[in-house]
């Protein structure tokens, strides 16, 4: 059994995966996706830092860095070719693409009947101002691609909307506006692996951003049946084998599914709940591929 990890060498998540694999008697080398070299003819068809990857049984994807359009497309194509050659890529290229795209995820969640905030995406300044008004004059503006709460701003007045939208226009950005959902400065992260919720935490923050990377503090949460159902359905919508599903407990007692993270972090979950997500993920994948070591 040959396993590799695409991620940050020495990073916490990478090392936790390597530790979980070692407990099963497997070693895994770690490479950055920026080290990928693909060959249309000859072998290896795909390598990283000269090491072949197309003879791997499993490749765990822990990071796809930001880059130019060409770089991102090439990296995702490389993952697809690995899958085409029979390598188990976790998560799949398609799931990663779906999860990173906030518009696509929101649209799929809505179409699947899951509760998710009203969202409007557009390219023109005038349409963005109209969307701000349509969504009630209290919105969260997000980058279409992003994570950890970076680049997200809340806008509650027209003057600020005008200035922010003009700045985004200069940067030739897409406008992604989502209605603000009152949530008591807390949200829920449910972690899904292999069709089950292995753990959940409530994240409390000083402000409206509830990402652990933005300083929110996690505490263990026993998910109810409704929360489990929403989390599993959300992960299925994007085709994720494992996912961190972010859900807002609304002030009216209902839930809103915000995002489905398909390269999810689990460090805060481990600290809050003691759940070893890396071990759960490794055990699930090895069972799926028939490894009994």
Where in this protein do the model-derived segments appear?
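Rossmann-like NAD(P)H-binding beta-loop-alpha module
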Residues: 112-136
């Amino acid at each position: 059994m040959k396993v590799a990890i695409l991620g940050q060498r020495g990073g916490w998540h990478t090392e936790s995966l390597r530790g979980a694999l070692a407990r099963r008697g497997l070693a895994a080398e770690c490479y950055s996706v920026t080290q990928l070299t693909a060959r249309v003819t000859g072998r290896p068809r795909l390598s990283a830092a000269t090491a072949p990857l197309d003879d791997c049984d499993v490749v765990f994807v822990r990071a796809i860095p930001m880059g130019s359009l060409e770089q991102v497309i090439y990296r995702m194509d490389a993952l697809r070719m690995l899958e085409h050659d029979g390598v188990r890529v976790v998560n799949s290229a398609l799931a990663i693409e779906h999860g990173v795209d906030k518009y696509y995820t929101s649209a799929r969640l809505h179409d699947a009947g899951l509760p998710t905030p009203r969202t409007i995406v557009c390219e023109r300044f005038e349409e963005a101002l109209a969307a701000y008004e349509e969504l009630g004059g209290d919105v969260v503006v997000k980058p279409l691609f992003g994570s950890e709460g970076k680049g997200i701003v809340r806008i509650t007045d027209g003057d600020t909307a005008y200035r922010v939208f003009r700045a985004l226009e200069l940067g030739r950005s897409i406008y992604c506006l989502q209605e603000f959902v009152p949530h008591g400065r807390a949200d829920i992260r449910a972690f899904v692996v292999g069709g089950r919720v292995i753990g959940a935490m409530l994240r409390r923050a000083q402000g409206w951003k509830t990402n652990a990377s933005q300083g929110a503090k996690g505490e263990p949460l026993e998910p109810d049946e409704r929360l489990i159902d929403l989390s599993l359905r959300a992960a299925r919508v994007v085709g994720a084998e494992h996912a961190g599903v972010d859900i807002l407990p609304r002030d009216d007692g209902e839930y809103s599914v915000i995002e489905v993270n398909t390269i999810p972090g689990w460090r805060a979950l481990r600290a809050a709940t003691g759940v070893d997500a890396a071990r759960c993920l490794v055990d699930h994948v090895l069972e799926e591929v028939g490894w009994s070591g």
